[in-house]
Swiss-Prot record:
Signal peptide, first to last residue: none
Protein name, per record: Small ribosomal subunit protein uS17
InterPro entries per the UniProt record, alphabetical: NA-bd_OB-fold, Ribosomal_uS17, Ribosomal_uS17_bact/chlr, Ribosomal_uS17_CS
CC annotations in GO: cytosolic small ribosomal subunit
Subunit record text: Part of the 30S ribosomal subunit.
GO biological process terms, semicolon-separated: translation
MF terms (GO), sorted A to Z: rRNA binding; structural constituent of ribosome
NCBIfam families per the UniProt record, alphabetical: PRK05610.1, uS17_bact
Function comment: One of the primary rRNA binding proteins, it binds specifically to the 5'-end of 16S ribosomal RNA.
Family classification: Belongs to the universal ribosomal protein uS17 family.
Organism per entry: Tolumonas auensis (strain DSM 9187 / NBRC 110442 / TA 4)
Keywords: Ribonucleoprotein, Ribosomal protein, RNA-binding, rRNA-binding
Length: 82
């Protein structure tokens, strides 16, 4: 069994915290009865060591060990500046 490190891309929606950002991850799912494709959003708290992200940036994040009660993701890179 190989352990794969989960990486996701999302948009920064808040950078008000020190060394932390909130990232919104959008995914498309099919409604079970209607069959319509709908967009679901998940908000994650991400560790940003150097406070380099601003609201609106597109970022790549990686899962890591729990850093606090709500943070278990860390910033890999800024894909696109806002």
């Amino acid at each position: 069994m190989t352990d794969q490190i989960r990486t996701l891309q999302g948009r920064v929606v808040s950078d008000k915290m020190d060394k932390s950002i909130t990232v919104a991850i959008e995914r498309k799912v099919k409604h079970p009865m209607l069959g319509k494709i709908i967009v679901r959003t998940t908000k994650l708290h991400v560790h940003d060591e150097n406070n380099e992200c601003k609201t609106g940036d597109l970022v790549e994040i990686r899962e890591c060990r729990p850093l606090s009660k709500t943070k278990c993701w860390t910033l890999v890179s800024v894909v696109e500046k806002a």
